């Protein structure tokens, strides 16, 4: 049984930055550090930070006065940002810069009174944060998930519309929704550059290549990770058995029955240590040396805030 590794896989620059922000805050200021929502959607990462003193909350009211608060990589609404400011909390923003780009698109639309349509999944924190950038009562902000949603959507002015997307969507599904938007609203304006982030696009391309060869595909990622779920769906659409797993412990030996090639990839919020543990487990079940597939090279780095770049020894 040959083990094939998708390339690229695992951490993206935005996730790496968000985790580093929490780690640096803990090093510089000690515990507790409060984080609004899971900083990234991965159980292993969140549990590790929790053990080091991070406290994950959903409501700003749960943060004591004068405490340090970190916004997650998914971003927050302006209402949440304003609430933190009014509470005089020390805030470090771990919002992925590529999510911030979409926030700015929405804010510009709101300022101009242009109605905005967001393609995304209802209830996802990134969507909630992005929708929360729009405040113009004379305009409108709408959420669609499918072409059917587009055809049922009612707007105020079909000639004054723009759209943007959640950063972690299925590329294929999103293009189908965009096609419907352009057909329904011919004058709609899209972003100058695709909102789906480079890491999402690259990992989806990699899992397609992986699915061409693998009989079964394991996607390392947590159930609440949007981009990890999309990877598993892509492999399934390719006709392959695909399993979204948090760790090697989730692997059932029966899933490997009859498999000659086993593919492994990881969502953008899954650390490499989990992938290595999966590889080790597959070897125990008869897998050979893991082979890296060819893929796109990623060298993007997002810096942490300058306030967190100081040496620990400078803090008394």
From Swiss-Prot:
Ligand binding ([4Fe-4S] cluster): 12, 96, 197
NCBIfam families linked: ispH_lytB (TIGR00216), PRK01045.1-2 (NF002188), PRK01045.1-4 (NF002190)
Primary enzyme class: oxidoreductase
Catalyzed reactions: isopentenyl diphosphate + 2 oxidized [2Fe-2S]-[ferredoxin] + H2O = (2E)-4-hydroxy-3-methylbut-2-enyl diphosphate + 2 reduced [2Fe-2S]-[ferredoxin] + 2 H(+); dimethylallyl diphosphate + 2 oxidized [2Fe-2S]-[ferredoxin] + H2O = (2E)-4-hydroxy-3-methylbut-2-enyl diphosphate + 2 reduced [2Fe-2S]-[ferredoxin] + 2 H(+)
Active site: 126 (proton donor)
A UniProt-annotated Pfam family: LYTB
Binding site for isopentenyl diphosphate: 41, 74, 124, 225-227, 269
Disulfide bonds: none
Transport recorded as keyword: no
Binding site for (2E)-4-hydroxy-3-methylbut-2-enyl diphosphate: 41, 74, 124, 167, 225-227, 269
Family: Belongs to the IspH family.
Coiled coil: none
The protein's role, per its UniProt record: Catalyzes the conversion of 1-hydroxy-2-methyl-2-(E)-butenyl 4-diphosphate (HMBPP) into a mixture of isopentenyl diphosphate (IPP) and dimethylallyl diphosphate (DMAPP). Acts in the terminal step of the DOXP/MEP pathway for isoprenoid precursor biosynthesis.
Pathways involved: Isoprenoid biosynthesis; dimethylallyl diphosphate biosynthesis; dimethylallyl diphosphate from (2E)-4-hydroxy-3-methylbutenyl diphosphate: step 1/1; Isoprenoid biosynthesis; isopentenyl diphosphate biosynthesis via DXP pathway; isopentenyl diphosphate from 1-deoxy-D-xylulose 5-phosphate: step 6/6
Cofactor: [4Fe-4S] cluster
Gene: ispH
Keywords annotated in UniProt: 4Fe-4S, Iron, Iron-sulfur, Isoprene biosynthesis, Metal-binding, Oxidoreductase
The protein's Enzyme Commission number: 1.17.7.4
Binding-site residues, dimethylallyl diphosphate: 41, 74, 124, 225-227, 269
GO biological process: dimethylallyl diphosphate biosynthetic process; isopentenyl diphosphate biosynthetic process, methylerythritol 4-phosphate pathway; terpenoid biosynthetic process
Name assigned to this protein: 4-hydroxy-3-methylbut-2-enyl diphosphate reductase
Subunit structure: Homodimer.
């Amino acid at each position: 049984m040959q083990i094939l590794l998708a390339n690229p896989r695992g951490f993206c620059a935005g996730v790496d930055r968000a985790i580093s922000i929490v780690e640096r805050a803990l090093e510089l200021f000690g515990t507790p550090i409060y984080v609004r929502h899971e900083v990234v959607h991965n159980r292993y990462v969140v549990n590790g930070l929790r053990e080091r003193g991070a406290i994950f909350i959903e409501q700003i009211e749960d943060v004591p006065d004068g405490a340090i608060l970190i916004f997650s990589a998914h971003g927050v609404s302006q209402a949440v940002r304003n609430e933190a400011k009014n509470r005089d909390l020390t805030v470090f923003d771990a919002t992925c810069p590529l999510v911030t780009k979409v926030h700015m698109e929405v804010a510009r639309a709101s300022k101009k009174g242009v109605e905005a349509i967001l393609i995304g999944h209802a209830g996802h924190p990134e969507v909630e944060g992005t929708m929360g950038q729009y405040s113009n009562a004379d305009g409108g902000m709408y959420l669609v998930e499918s072409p059917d949603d587009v055809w049922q959507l009612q707007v105020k002015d079909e000639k004054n519309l723009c759209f943007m997307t959640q950063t972690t969507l299925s590329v294929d599904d999103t293009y189908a929704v965009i096609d419907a938007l352009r057909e329904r609203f011919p004058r709609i304006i899209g972003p100058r550059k695709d909102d789906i982030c480079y890491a999402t696009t690259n990992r989806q391309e990699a899992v397609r290549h992986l699915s061409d060869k693998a009989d079964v595909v394991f996607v390392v990622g947590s159930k609440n990770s949007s981009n990890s779920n999309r990877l598993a769906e892509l492999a399934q659409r390719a006709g392959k058995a695909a399993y979204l797993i948090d760790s090697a412990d989730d692997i059932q030996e029966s899933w490997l029955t009859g498999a000659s090639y086993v593919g492994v990839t990881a969502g953008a919020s899954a650390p490499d240590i989990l992938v290595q543990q999966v590889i080790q487990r597959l070897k125990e079940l008869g897998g050979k040396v893991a082979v890296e597939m060819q893929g796109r090279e990623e060298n993007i780095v997002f810096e942490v805030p300058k306030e967190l770049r100081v040496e620990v020894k400078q803090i008394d």
